[in-house]
Amino acid sequence: MKPISKKLLIHTVTLYKKISTDKWGSEKLDPGQTLSNIRIEPSKQIIRDKNNAEVQLAATLFYDCRNSRPSDVSFKVDQIIDFNGQKYQIKTVEPLYDNSKLHHYEIGMVRYGKN
């Protein structure tokens, strides 16, 4: 299967990891990592979280394993994505394979309320 075309991978975002939470619930984020050649699409998909509650996704991030940069990114649930000043929280990480080789990731995200 061919990689996702660079013509479609038109967005750049910043990926943040939570490094601590204080006793009042304020979260501290790391300096962030810029991801380029990715795609963000609006979404209305409904999923179930780890507590079996229904959650409606706000957007899906597409990360191609060949064309997206940097190439050594590891996505985890609860990381934060900043796209054009709007923050999103990762809720699902779905690796998709071409035969036995990882082709791309589809990352389900909800709006992150603590801007």
Predicted regions and their residues:
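Active-site-proximal polar cores
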Residues: 1-27
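Short, conserved turn/kink motifs that form compact alpha/beta structural patches or helix kinks used as
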Residues: 18-21, 26-115
